[in-house]
């Protein structure tokens, strides 16, 4: 498995589409999924390749002079539980720390609302993210937003 930074905007969108289309339980709203795919072209983009096949990706965006946000991530279902998400995050942590950032943050639906997102929460916590704050209405009342943060220093 190789993790590398992708810079070509078209390739970023192709990878995002190929992965997100298979993860409809998390990305079920077609308009939102398409918006993620389009916006992925403008983010710092890491991809996991099994030989030449992209099997996962992670996108980062700057949210402040010291902070990057993990704003989008996906791994093909058949590659779940194989350490690929962890490898993507570890590579992103190293690269962003080397770029001078101090913190990495991520948002997800608060624990206890949906089983699939409980799995996502456990994943982020297993990587060392710490619960920072919940915004009950950031997205909507049925999807309270949990913010996790991690120090890169």
Describe the predicted segments one by one.
Residues 1-30:
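Short amphipathic alpha-helix that is part of the acyltransferase structural core
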Residues 115-120, 134-144:
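Short glycine/proline-centered loop/turn elements that form peptide/ligand docking sites
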């Amino acid at each position: 498995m190789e993790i590398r930074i992708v810079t070509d905007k078209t390739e970023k969108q192709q990878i995002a589409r190929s992965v997100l289309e298979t993860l409809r339980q998390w990305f079920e709203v077609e308009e939102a999924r398409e918006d993620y795919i389009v916006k992925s072209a403008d983010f710092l983009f890491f991809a996991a390749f099994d030989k030449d096949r992209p099997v996962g990706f992670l996108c980062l965006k700057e949210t402040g002079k010291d902070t990057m946000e993990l704003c989008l991530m996906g791994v093909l279902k058949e590659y779940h539980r194989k350490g690929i998400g962890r490898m993507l995050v570890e590579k992103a942590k190293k690269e962003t720390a080397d770029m001078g950032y101090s913190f990495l943050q991520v948002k997800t639906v608060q624990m206890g609302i949906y089983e699939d997102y409980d799995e996502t929460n456990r994943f982020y916590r297993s990587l060392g993210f710490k619960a920072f704050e919940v915004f009950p209405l950031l997205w909507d009342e049925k999807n309270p937003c949990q913010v996790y943060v991690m120090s890169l220093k």
